[in-house]
């Protein structure tokens, strides 16, 4: 169903709070309300939740959003741009995989970050990143043996991550950098310079 005044209020209150944790809570609550809790918000990756939210917003308020975007050529002028939300989609990076081979014998299978992983706001930036990485490890493989995340304690996972080389860690970072994301390219000209 589309947004009602109730959902608009939730969104406005979250915007006023200016906290990521409040925005995430609002996103979760709005999707739950508008889908009659038929979507398992806690289990979906963030990019799917963002896409669902955009679709609900498009059907509720309208498909076209008016934005003011900073012009790159002078870094100070803003241009009025319209974006059709029906044209916004989830972008998948070619070659992306959730399977990361760290060595000839050891690999990890990752899951995509979910909304409950993103609300680690009480932690510092570094702790937040490591928290998301730890929570995204789904399996660890050693040869033909597969170990489930549930088989490891928090201490085991911390020790595993601490034992990785910089190269291994870069492979994990690449997983996050290339994972699917909401993206839409908009072409516009600076109203002052016409570039």
Outline where the language-model segments fall.
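Short, surface-exposed, charged amphipathic helix/loop patches that serve as local interaction elements
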Residues: 1-195
């Amino acid at each position: 169903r589309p947004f009602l005044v109730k959902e608009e209020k939730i969104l406005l209150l979250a915007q006023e709070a200016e906290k990521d944790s409040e925005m995430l809570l609002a996103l979760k609550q709005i999707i739950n309300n508008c889908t009659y809790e038929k979507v398992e918000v806690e289990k979906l990756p963030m990019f799917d939740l963002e896409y669902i939210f955009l679709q609900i917003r498009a059907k509720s308020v309208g498909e076209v959003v008016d934005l003011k975007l900073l012009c790159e050529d002078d870094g100070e002028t803003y241009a009025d741009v319209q974006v059709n939300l029906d044209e916004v989609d989830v972008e998948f990076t070619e070659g992306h995989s959730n399977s990361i081979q760290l060595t000839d014998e050891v690999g990890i299978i990752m899951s995509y970050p979910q909304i409950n992983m993103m609300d680690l706001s009480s932690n510092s930036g570094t702790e937040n990143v490591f928290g998301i990485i730890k929570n995204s490890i789904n399996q660890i493989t050693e040869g033909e043996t597969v170990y489930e995340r549930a088989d490891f304690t928090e201490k085991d996972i911390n020790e595993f991550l601490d034992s990785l080389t910089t190269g291994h860690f870069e492979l994990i970072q690449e997983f996050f950098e290339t994972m699917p994301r909401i993206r839409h390219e908009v072409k516009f000209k600076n109203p002052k310079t016409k570039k």
